[in-house]
């Protein structure tokens, strides 16, 4: 089960992009990867055609493994730091909660 969803703020915990943070653009659970805004940038040489208006060297985000990402705690004394996630039942619905501060992670998405 993925604990990271689209729109979450995450921080990279290992690799060349360590300590960089950004918002998740897309999650691919089958491949266990995610696209994070501003993290793991690559350069691609691209020709101009009907689908791509720009030509030349394009910089874009590359997928990064989910095991290298951790959710950022939105509140509490550890605001902005990595946290683990636990699930609680609230009104017969599963809610994601930050382990460090105990704040709900899905509350601001509605």
Swiss-Prot record:
A Pfam family of this chain: KOW
PROSITE patterns reported in the protein's UniProt record: RIBOSOMAL_L24
One GO term (biological process): translation
One GO cellular component term noted in the UniProt record for this chain: ribosome
Gene Ontology terms, MF aspect: rRNA binding; structural constituent of ribosome
Functional note: One of two assembly initiator proteins, it binds directly to the 5'-end of the 23S rRNA, where it nucleates assembly of the 50S subunit. One of the proteins that surrounds the polypeptide exit tunnel on the outside of the subunit.
Subunit field text: Part of the 50S ribosomal subunit.
Family assignment from sequence similarity: Belongs to the universal ribosomal protein uL24 family.
NCBIfam families: rplX_bact
The name this protein goes by in its record: Large ribosomal subunit protein uL24
């Amino acid at each position: 089960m993925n604990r990271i969803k689209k729109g979450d703020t995450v921080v990279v915990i290992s690799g060349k992009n360590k300590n960089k943070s950004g918002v998740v653009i897309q999650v691919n659970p089958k491949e266990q990867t995610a696209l994070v805004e501003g993290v793991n940038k690559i350069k691609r040489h691209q020709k101009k055609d009907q689908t791509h208006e720009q030509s030349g060297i394009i910089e874009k985000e590359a997928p990064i493994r989910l095991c290298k990402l951790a959710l950022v705690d939105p509140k509490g004394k550890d605001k902005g730091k990595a946290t683990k996630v636990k699930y609680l039942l609230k009104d017969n619905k599963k809610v994601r909660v930050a382990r460090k501060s105990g704040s709900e992670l899905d509350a601001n998405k509605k």
